[in-house]
Amino acid sequence: MAMSLVKSIWESGVLRFRNKGTLTPIITLGTLRLHEYLVVTDVDSRNAAPTAAQFLGGIITHNSQTGAGTLTVPTGALLDAAVQGLAIGETVKCYYLNRGDQTVTVTAAAGITIADTGQTVATTEAAILIFLKTAADTFVCYHIGA
């Protein structure tokens, strides 16, 4: 997120970063640990292809149905455009929950390399997807868990 779109506020001894336009919390730096503010996107279909904005919301729940399915990540160009100011070597992450009754395979779109191709997320299992920016419009997705 571009710095001009962020407002920082000291409140009750913690530093909060908010969206400058809506004042929606983005991240809080407190005395104990970092606090993230996440948005849940729910997909009810065999195959899911959430948008870059939905991935950046932080949590994808997927009700996989009627046979093995896929979770297709957004293209590198779309992800790069959605995360303004992300430098090479920086990461973004998303928590993924397969709450359906089918196994799901994480699949790549253009500009994305899945580090552990073929890794699946079994029924009622979860994974953390970490996207490492390696060049403009180019990411490696690390699939941790499940």
Can you describe what each PLM-predicted range is?
Residues 1-32:
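Register-specific beta-strand positions within repetitive beta-rich fiber domains
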Residues 20, 24-110, 119, 123-125, ...:
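Exposed extracellular interaction/assembly regions and N-terminal maturation sites
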Residues 113-114:
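A conserved acidic, glycine/proline-rich C-terminal tail/linker
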